[in-house]
């Protein structure tokens, strides 16, 4: 993919496997965030949740992966997200990335995208945007 071939409106969508408690624990280990509400149902219930839930940054990481896979790992110049809803065991998340603009800045060809992560019911857990630098 090059700057000349990417067009405003181009889109990538990726569906991820259903979330599991094991994924939450693995993410805790990778991130160092061992807040027990992400892996202990008793603690999650004590703070008003029906069960454990995924880290917001786990959802963000899935979105970043779609951007990285499309444009390349060195291409990401900016990534900004807003966490909207929690994700739960069994949720099937879909990330959609849509090109919203192209521009040249500081000698780089930049592509702006909007991104969303939503569950199987269409409920958004993450919304944001990113900028990637691409070759001519």
Report the location of each language-model feature.
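Hot-dog-fold acyl-thioester-processing enzymes
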Residues: 1-75
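HotDog/MaoC-like acyl-thioester-processing domains
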Residues: 1-12, 86-136
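Hydrophobic residues in beta-strands and at strand termini
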Residues: 16-19, 83, 134
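Sparse recognition of residues in long alpha-helices and their boundaries
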Residues: 43, 79, 106-107
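Mid-chain, well-packed structural core segment of small domains
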Residues: 69-95
